[in-house]
Amino acid sequence: MRVAAYPGTFDPPTIAHLAVAEAALVTCPVDRVELVLSRDPIGKSAPTPLHERLGAIDALRADRPWLSVAVTDHRLIADVCEGYDVVVMGADKWAQVLDPSYHESETHWHASLARLPLVAVARRGDVPIEPHALGGTVILLDVDLGEVSSSAVRAGRTDWRAL
């Protein structure tokens, strides 16, 4: 069984998260997409409590048997996706993965990039994507929901909520 890890805070899950997961299911192809929530995500301060985020994802998974959820204490994508066949992310997260400032050294950064499985990246507005950054192990997902964001949903934008 081929499984894709889709790391994120999903605070809350949006129509964009769901569209990216569905695109990964078909494009990669995989048998299952696992939403992987970090207990302490990089670059996110005070996310909604984990049990509330898990409850929202459980409701989302109810009629999607190919969608699962996992929780991790890892923070770096290379650690989160270890053991998976594919790692799925938006262009904004991909830009973060390619930023060496999130690592203790350039050597650590290069080692982390080398550990990544196949990477599936979804466009996100005008955020540039470097599809050749890992020498051909990056594929682009045919989905772009532009400005859809969890921040906007938390601020009251209900039509972007996945539930």
Question: What label would you give each PLM region?
Answer:
Residues 1-163:
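Nucleotidyltransferase catalytic core that binds NTPs
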